[in-house]
């Protein structure tokens, strides 16, 4: 026979073959202090859990998206940041170019709205090329993450919309106004209430409204998945926020980068 144990249990076999199962106090087992996060093993555990949260959101986005641009071309990203917009994890299937642009977009959202004007039910949106990825088809959405009433980070996603109005696949536009609909930094969802006026404007200005709206809803769903998983991590390990993890990730990343640069032979490099 097979005995299946929960993750918070331990088992021993006594001399006569009986199974002694003990339920472990998960609060004592999982609690990480600030110093422990710097431990390589603990950092690896937490960091991989955050990456897994982004990966799960990306898988959901792919399954739920309407357009082939996202579903087959993988022209999207899912990112988790700390409360200052510093990147903690990006989904493994996200395209590399967004790894630098999306955290910057989150920082622009923070500067535009300020943290005190954000609520747990908010979702922010923009496709401003100067605050986003450089062109209008990439729509970025961002959700503030709260734990115990405190802003602890952001989940964010960028996806290339199948259409955003304007001229189709043409190098002719000389101004951004010819490229399509511009969405300034707005609250697409304000404290749980969808901005239907904005959605109507968006639908009326694109050629494939169902696909554009469907992809956008898939992005919003992905934000919610990242929100839930991050709060699960914080509760499981009794962390108040992501600040200590963020510091540890940045320190480890800086160290690895410096080591790689140090390994480069001296010389003149051109690109």
What is each residue range found by the language model?
Residues 1-271:
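C-terminal, non-catalytic interaction/recognition modules in large multi-subunit enzymes and RNPs
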